[in-house]
UniProtKB/Swiss-Prot annotation:
The modification Phosphoserine is found at S33. It comes from Danio rerio (Zebrafish). The gene is nsrp1. Residues 207-221 have a biased composition (Low complexity). Keywords: Coiled coil, Phosphoprotein. Residues 100-176, 358-401 form a coiled coil. Pfam families: NSRP1_N. Residues 1-43, 111-137, 151-170, 188-494 are annotated as: Disordered. Belongs to the NSRP1 family. Signal peptide: none annotated. This is Nuclear speckle splicing regulatory protein 1. Residues 222-239, 271-466 have a biased composition (Basic and acidic residues). One of its GO terms (biological process) is regulation of alternative mRNA splicing, via spliceosome.
Length: 516
C-alpha cells in the first residue's frame, strides 16, 4: 500500500537549501566575441514559433472536422442574440411589466384638474356677472387654445351625461322592477350572452382591466358599471357573473340603452338626474368647505404666532411709554411748583412778611415750655418786690393773663395790697389798649391787602405769563437731577405758613383755656 503524500501532526516549516549559484569562471576567450551565442538564441525562438503555429493549425483542422460551421460568426450572430433575449425573458418572468397603480392615479389627477378648472370658470363667471355692463364696450379676445379647451370641456360634459343616463338605465337599484335582471337570464339562455367559467373569470378580469387601462373609453366604463350592477343582482339569486366579449357587450349596452331610453326621458329619469347632480354639487361644496376650513385654521395659527410676537413687542413699547409719561409728568409738576413759588414770593408784600414774623414770634411764646416757664416766673413774682411785679405785669402779654384760671386770679388779688393793685390796673389798661390797637391795625392791613390785590391782579397775571415763559425756557436747560428748592422758595413757604397761622389766630372769637 503506497503512502499518501499528506502529512499529519506538527509540521514545522523547513528552509530549503538555496541552490548555490554557479561561480563564473574566468574564461580565457571571454572578451573575444558574442556572435555564436546570439545566433543560437534566435534559432531557438524561431523553432518555438513554428511549433506553436503547427499546433494551432492542427487544432483548427480538428474543430472543422467536428463542426464545419464553427468559424462562421456572421451567420450565427442573429441566433445567438435571440437565445440571449429568450434567456433574459425567462429570468425576468414574462414580457414587459405594466404598472399596477399609476394609471388610476393619473386618471384621478386628471379628474381633479378638470374639477379645478370648472371651479375657476364658475368663479370667473360670477366676477363677470358682478361687473355687469362695466366692460361691455370693450373688445373680447379669445385664443384658439381657450376655444379648444372649451370644446373639450363641452364634450366631457356630454360624455358624463351619457354615462349617467346609461348608468341610470342599467342600474338595477334605480329600476322599478327586475326586468333588466331577467333580460340577462333570457340573453344567457338564448345564447346572446356567454356564461363565463369560474376558472377563467380571474383571467378575463385581468384582460379587461388591461384593456381599460390602454383605452379608457365610455363603452368600457359602461361595461364595468354593467358588470357591477349584475354582480349586485346575482348575489340574491345565483352566483353567476356575466363577463362577455367586447363586441357583444357593446351591442348589449346599446340595445339596453335603446330599451330604457323612454324611462330616462320620462319625469322619473329627470328627477334622478337632478338628484345625482345635487349630490355631486353637494360633494364639491363639502370639499371646498373643508379646504376653506383648513386654510382658515392655517391662517389662525399664523395669526396667533404673529399676535404672540406682537404682544411681546407691544408690552415692551407700553412699558417704555409709561416710563416716558411718568418722566414728563414729574417734569410738569416740578415746573408748576416752581411757578407757584415764584408767584407767591412776588405776591407777598412787606406787610405780609412782617405779619408772618410776628405770628412766628407769638407761636414761639405760646409753646408749652414757655407757658411752664411763665408759671414759674409768676410764683417767683409773688415773692419779689412791687416794682419787679409791676415790670413783669407790663412785660407780660395779655394772652398769658387770659390763660390763667379764675382761681389764680382771685388768689393774686387777695394777696396783693391796694397800693400794689393800682400799678397792676394801669398795666392791664395799657395792655388792653395795646391789644385793641393791634387788632385794629390787623383789620386795616387786611382791607389794604384786599384792595391792593384786586388792583394789581391784572398786572401780575401779565407779568406771570411772561415770567413763566422765560422760566420754562430756563428750566428746560436745567438738568433733571438739579436741586429745585432754593433759600428764597423755603423762606417764602415759611412766610406763607406763618401768615396762615396768624390769620387763623386772629379770626378766633374765643379764648382757649389751659388746665393746670
Amino acid at each position: 500500500m503506497a503512502t499518501s503524500g499528506k502529512q499529519y501532526g506538527l509540521i514545522l516549516p523547513q528552509k530549503r537549501a538555496s541552490k548555490s549559484a554557479p561561480l563564473a569562471r574566468p574564461s580565457v576567450f571571454g572578451d573575444d566575441s558574442d556572435d555564436e551565442t546570439s545566433v543560437g538564441e534566435s534559432l531557438q525562438k524561431e523553432a518555438i514559433k513554428k511549433k506553436m503555429m503547427k499546433q494551432t493549425r492542427l487544432e483548427m483542422q480538428k474543430a472543422l472536422e467536428e463542426d464545419s460551421t464553427v468559424y462562421e460568426y456572421d451567420n450565427v450572430y442573429d441566433d445567438i442574440q435571440k437565445q440571449r433575449l429568450e434567456s433574459n425573458k425567462k429570468l425576468l418572468g414574462g414580457e414587459d411589466k405594466k404598472p399596477k397603480y399609476i394609471n388610476q392615479l393619473l386618471r384621478a389627477v386628471e379628474e381633479r384638474k378638470k374639477e379645478q378648472e370648472r371651479r375657476d370658470e364658475r368663479k370667473i363667471q360670477k366676477e363677470r356677472e358682478a361687473e355687469g355692463e362695466k366692460f361691455a364696450d370693450k373688445e373680447a379676445f379669445v385664443t384658439s387654445a381657450y376655444r379648444q379647451k372649451l370644446k373639450e370641456r363641452q364634450e366631457e360634459l356630454e360624455r358624463e351625461k351619457r354615462e349617467a343616463e346609461l348608468e341610470a338605465a342599467l342600474d338595477v337599484k334605480k329600476q322599478k322592477d327586475l326586468s333588466g335582471f331577467y333580460r340577462h337570464f333570457l340573453n344567457q339562455t338564448v345564447g346572446e350572452e356567454v356564461v363565463p367559467d369560474r376558472s377563467a373569470q380571474s383571467e378575463e378580469k385581468a384582460t379587461s382591466s388591461a384593456a381599460a387601462e390602454r383605452s379608457p373609453s365610455p363603452e368600457s366604463t359602461a361595461n364595468r358599471r354593467e358588470s357591477e350592477a349584475e354582480s349586485h343582482s346575482d348575489d340574491d339569486q345565483v352566483d353567476v357573473k356575466p363577463a362577455f366579449s367586447k363586441t357583444t357587450a357593446n351591442n348589449h349596452a346599446k340595445r339596453q340603452y335603446r330599451q330604457k331610453s323612454p324611462l330616462s326621458d320620462s319625469d322619473d329619469g329627470d328627477e334622478r338626474e337632478r338628484e345625482r347632480k345635487e349630490i355631486k354639487e353637494k360633494s364639491h361644496k363639502d370639499r371646498d368647505r373643508d379646504r376653506a376650513k383648513e386654510k382658515e385654521r392655517e391662517r389662525m395659527r399664523d395669526k396667533d404666532k404673529h399676535s404672540h410676537r406682537k404682544e411681546d413687542r407691544g408690552g415692551d413699547r407700553r412699558r417704555e411709554r409709561d416710563r416716558e409719561e411718568d418722566r414728563a409728568r414729574d417734569r410738569r409738576d416740578r415746573d408748576r411748583n416752581d411757578r407757584h413759588g415764584i408767584r407767591d414770593r412776588r405776591n407777598s408784600s412787606p406787610k405780609d412778611r412782617e405779619r408772618d414774623r410776628k405770628g412766628e414770634r407769638d407761636r414761639r411764646d405760646n409753646s408749652p415750655k414757655d407757658r411752664e416757664r411763665d408759671r414759674k416766673g409768676e410764683r417767683d413774682r409773688r415773692d419779689n418786690s412791687p416794682k419787679d411785679r409791676e415790670r413783669e405785669t407790663r412785660d407780660k402779654s395779655p394772652k398769658d393773663r387770659r390763660d390763667k384760671s379764675p382761681k389764680d386770679r382771685d388768689r393774686e388779688r387777695r394777696d396783693k395790697s391796694p397800693k400794689d393793685r393800682e400799678p397792676e390796673r394801669k398795666g392791664e389798661r395799657d395792655i388792653r389798649e395795646r391789644e385793641d390797637n393791634k387788632v385794629d391795625s390787623q383789620r386795616k392791613n387786611q382791607e389794604d391787602e384786599k384792595s391792593s390785590k384786586s388792583k394789581t391782579e391784572h398786572g401780575k397775571e401779565e407779568k406771570l405769563v411772561e415770567e413763566t415763559e422765560n422760566s420754562s425756557g430756563a428750566q428746560q436747560e436745567i438738568s433733571k437731577f438739579a436741586k429745585r428748592s432754593s433759600d428764597q422758595t423755603v423762606s417764602s413757604a415759611r412766610e406763607r405758613y406763618l401768615a396762615r397761622q396768624l390769620a387763623r389766630f386772629a379770626s378766633k372769637s374765643y379764648v382757649e383755656k389751659e388746665e393746670d
